[in-house]
Amino acid sequence: MPKSDTKQKKRRSNKNRLRIKRARLFGPKDIDQVKEDIESQKKIEYDPELPGGGHFYCCECDRHFITEKVLMEHKRSNPHRRRAKEVREVAHSQRDAEWAVGLT
């Protein structure tokens, strides 16, 4: 009789669940923080602890990359395009919220 791999499946599902939870907790910056970073455009100095020395950075996604080639591939990806679209959109204001409810 073949050996069951239920322990492996359980381990795998736990890893996936923990990975998703960690991504939710320590995910990318909020949109308003990203907009502030883009407006300030601070120069990033060399940091040996960051990938690529901190030179290849995507502001919208808050990610560092090893080379410029990898950064360009990332900028062509769908997750980056979605995030960039979110950043470009105008944020809702209190006035918009009141209008939607019908207070004004």
Curated annotation (Swiss-Prot):
SUPFAM superfamilies hit by this protein: beta-beta-alpha zinc fingers
Residue stretches spanning the membrane: none
UniProt-recorded Gene Ontology molecular function terms: zinc ion binding
Pfam families assigned: zf-C2H2_jaz
Zinc finger (C2H2-type): 56-80
InterPro entries: C2H2-ZF_Maturation_Protein, Znf_C2H2_jaz, Znf_C2H2_sf, Znf_C2H2_type
Main location: nucleus
Keyword NADP listed: no
Biological process, per Gene Ontology: ribosome biogenesis
Subcellular location: Nucleus; Cytoplasm
Cellular component, GO annotation: cytoplasm; nucleus
UniProt entry keywords in alphabetical sequence: Cytoplasm, Metal-binding, Nucleus, Ribosome biogenesis, Zinc, Zinc-finger
Region forming the signal peptide: none
Domain of life, source organism: Eukaryota
UniProt cross-references to PANTHER family, sorted A to Z: ZINC FINGER PROTEIN 593
Assembly, per entry: Associates with pre-60S ribosomal particles; released from the pre-60S particle very early in the cytoplasm.
Described function: Involved in pre-60S ribosomal particles maturation by promoting the nuclear export of the 60S ribosome.
Family: Belongs to the ZNF593/BUD20 C2H2-type zinc-finger protein family.
Listed name of the protein: Zinc finger C2H2 protein ECU02_0310
Taxonomic source organism: Encephalitozoon cuniculi (strain GB-M1) (Microsporidian parasite)
